[in-house]
C-alpha cells in the first residue's frame, strides 16, 4: 500500500479538536475543548467539511468572561467528548474545567440531544461527589441496552464514573485505584524526548481512553501516562451504582479485586472496539500511530496499523454505520500546555480509515 493511502482527510479545523462521533444515519459531530479562550465553538456538526455550532449558537455562547452572565448548567463550558448512543441520540460530556483548570460550579454534566429534533432532551448534572475540583471527565461509553454510561476521569485523581441513565444517579468508583492513576514509572515522550511543560511537569493524564465490548459485558480503560490496558466486568460496576449498601472504600476494594490486566499498549489516548471485527484500535500519541489489538489473544502484543506524521497526537475514535473508522488529531504536544508560544488557534484534522484486515501489519508515512 503506498504511503499515506490508509488515511482520508474528512475535515480540517481552526481549533483543537478532541471528540468525534458518527450517528446511526451518518451525521458527524465533533467537539473543541476550551483549552484556550479563543475557542468559539464547543460542539459542532460537520456538514460538507464545515463546522456548524450544535445544537445552536446559544449553547456555544459561554465564555470565561461571561461567567456571571451565562449559566454553566445549560451552556457548553469545556466539552471533552461527544458520543452517539445505541438509540441514536447524541450525548455530550462537559467536564466544565477550562484549560483543564478549576471546575466551573454547576457546569459538569452529561447532556443528551435528540437528533430527531436537534434539541437537548435532558441533562445529568454531576455534583462534587462525582466531579470534584481537580477532576476532568474525559470520555464516555454506553451499554447496548441504553441503561448505563461509563466515564473516565483523567484529572488529578483518576477514577471511573458509572451513571444509571434511568435515574440520573452517578457514582465515582476506583477513585485513586492504581488502574485509574497516571503511572509514575512512565514518561510520555515525543520526538524521542520527554514531553514537559515549562515548569518541568510531564504528561500527567490519568484514566482517559475507554472502550466497551460489543456485548456490553466488559469495560476497558487506560491512562495516557501509562502503558497497561485494564478491564472489568460491567456486572460488577452495575452493582456499585444501583446499591449503596457498602461504603465507597470497601466497594472500591471489592471492584479492584475483579480488575484484569489485558496487556500493554504503551502510552495511549483513544480506544474503540470495532463492531465490524471486534478488534480494539488504540491511538498512540508518542509515535503518530494507530495500533490494533486482538482481544481474543489475552496478553498479546499490539500491531501498528497506521504510522503517519499527519497523525499528530491521534486522539479519539468513532465508527460510522458502514464500519469506517474516524480519528481526530488534537496536537496536544504543540499546544500552549507544552509550548508557551503556541498560537491560541491550533489547526487540527479529522481522518477516516478502513478497519484492519485479520493479518494487517499496517502502512507507514515517513515523518516530515
What is the role of each PLM region?
Residues 43-49, 106-118, 163-164, 168, ...:
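Beta-propeller blade signature
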Residues 13-25, 68-89, 93, 130-149, ...:
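Beta-rich, blade/repeat-based domains predominating
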Residues 29-64, 100-105, 109, 113-116:
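Beta-propeller domains
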Residues 6-8, 51-74, 118-132, 170-200, ...:
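Surface-exposed loop and turn segments in beta-propeller and other repeat-based domains
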Residues 30-36, 75, 92-95, 151-155, ...:
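Conserved beta-strand positions in repeat-built beta-propeller and related beta-rich domains
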Residues 116, 165-170, 178, 232-247, ...:
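Short loop/turn segments immediately following beta-strands, especially the blade-tip
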Residues 7-41:
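Beta-strand-rich domains and repeat architectures in extracellular enzymes and scaffolds
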Residues 318-368:
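Blade-level signature of beta-propeller repeat domains, shared across WD40, Kelch, NHL, RCC1
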Amino acid at each position: 500500500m503506498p504511503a499515506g493511502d490508509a488515511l482520508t482527510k474528512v475535515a480540517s479545523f481552526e481549533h483543537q479538536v478532541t471528540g468525534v462521533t458518527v450517528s446511526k444515519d451518518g451525521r458527524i459531530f465533533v467537539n473543541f475543548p476550551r483549552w484556550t479562550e479563543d475557542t468559539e465553538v464547543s460542539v459542532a456538526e460537520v456538514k460538507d467539511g464545515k463546522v456548524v455550532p450544535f445544537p445552536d449558537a446559544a449553547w456555544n455562547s459561554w465564555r470565561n468572561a461571561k461567567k456571571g452572565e451565562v449559566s454553566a448548567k445549560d451552556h457548553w463550558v469545556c466539552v471533552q467528548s461527544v458520543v452517539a448512543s445505541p438509540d441514536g441520540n447524541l450525548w455530550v460530556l462537559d467536564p466544565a474545567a477550562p484549560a483543564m483548570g478549576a471546575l466551573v460550579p454547576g457546569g459538569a454534566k452529561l447532556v443528551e440531544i435528540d437528533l430527531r429534533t436537534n434539541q437537548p432532551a435532558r441533562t445529568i448534572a454531576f455534583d462534587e461527589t462525582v466531579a470534584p475540583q481537580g477532576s476532568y471527565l474525559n470520555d464516555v461509553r454506553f451499554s447496548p441496552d441504553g441503561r448505563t454510561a461509563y466515564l473516565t476521569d483523567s484529572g488529578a485523581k483518576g477514577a471511573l464514573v458509572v451513571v444509571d441513565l434511568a435515574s440520573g444517579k452517578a457514582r465515582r468508583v476506583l477513585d485513586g485505584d492504581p488502574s485509574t492513576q497516571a503511572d509514575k514509572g512512565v514518561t510520555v515522550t515525543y520526538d524521542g524526548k520527554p514531553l514537559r511543560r515549562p515548569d518541568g511537569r510531564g504528561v500527567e493524564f490519568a484514566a482517559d481512553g475507554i472502550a466497551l465490548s460489543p456485548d456490553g459485558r466488559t469495560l476497558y480503560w487506560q491512562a495516557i501516562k501509562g502503558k497497561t490496558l485494564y478491564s472489568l466486568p460491567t456486572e460488577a460496576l452495575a452493582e456499585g451504582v444501583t446499591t449503596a449498601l457498602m461504603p465507597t472504600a470497601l466497594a472500591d476494594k471489592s471492584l479492584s479485586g475483579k480488575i484484569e490486566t489485558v496487556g500493554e499498549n504503551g502510552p495511549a489516548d483513544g480506544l474503540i472496539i470495532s463492531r465490524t471485527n471486534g478488534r480494539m484500535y488504540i491511538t498512540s500519541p508518542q509515535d503518530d500511530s494507530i495500533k490494533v489489538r486482538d482481544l481474543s489473544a489475552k496478553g498479546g502484543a499490539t500491531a501498528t496499523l497506521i504510522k503517519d506524521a499527519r497523525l499528530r497526537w491521534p486522539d479519539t475514535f468513532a465508527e460510522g454505520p458502514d464500519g469506517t473508522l474516524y480519528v481526530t488529531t488534537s496536537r496536544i504536544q504543540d499546544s500552549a500546555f507544552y509550548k508557551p508560544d503556541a498560537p491560541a488557534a491550533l489547526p487540527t484534522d479529522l481522518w477516516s480509515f478502513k478497519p484492519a484486515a485479520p493479518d494487517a501489519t499496517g502502512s507507514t508515512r515517513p515523518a516530515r
